[in-house]
Amino acid sequence: MIQGNPNLDPNKAPARVILNEVNSNNPSQIKGFLEVAGGKAQVIVANPSGIICNGCGTINAGRMTLTTGKPQFNQDGSLAGYQVERGVIRVEGGGLNADSRHDTQYVDLLARAVEINSGVWAKEKIAIVAGKNKVDTQNKATPIESQVAQPEFAIDMGQMGGMYSGYIHMVGTEKGVGVRNQGGHIQADKTLTVKSNGQLVWQSAKTQEAVTQANGDITLLAKDNLIHQGKLHSGGV
């Protein structure tokens, strides 16, 4: 049984946002589920040094946000967004929300670069925003000029990677930095949108069935070259 926080006043409204800010030179390694006791709340893990998710997920959290950005606040103390300058989020091994216990509607992955080598699940929407950005709480990104070395790919999904949700939205904002899918499985019950401010390389596995599927529209946009190999299946018009 998960005990509630005894420092919170039970006569006041429950927490809506739970921020776990990590100050470390090492990436956070999350190998289990984070459970919210009481009313549903957004769970945020922020570590500029990076985050490794291997069997991570949330229970009783409407929204799960993993970010390498530094949280920014409004004058009233509410969360304004994140300043992302560095750090990689890696999803591997046991994946994210792979356990049937999860009831997470929204998953946000906000980092300089994101690597997907296992499955990611959310009931309503998966949003990935990669690049050096200021990102608000609605995942709207404003790019920050960068003078340091850039990653080769802002978002890189391997053949063992996958995403399963209603809406799937992936955007790489950094100029000249690409987005790549190396045969990972995509299943969007509604729409799939992928945008790259560099090249976009989208490879589907060599099977009879399309491994990129959406019941609605599929949108692939690239500032530079767009290379697609394999099958796409869209139920949109």
Indicate residue ranges for each PLM-predicted region.
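Solvent-exposed adhesion/ligand-recognition segments of exported proteins
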Residues: M1-A188, K195-G198, E209
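Binding/recognition "hotspot" determinant
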Residues: G87, P151, T191, S196-V237
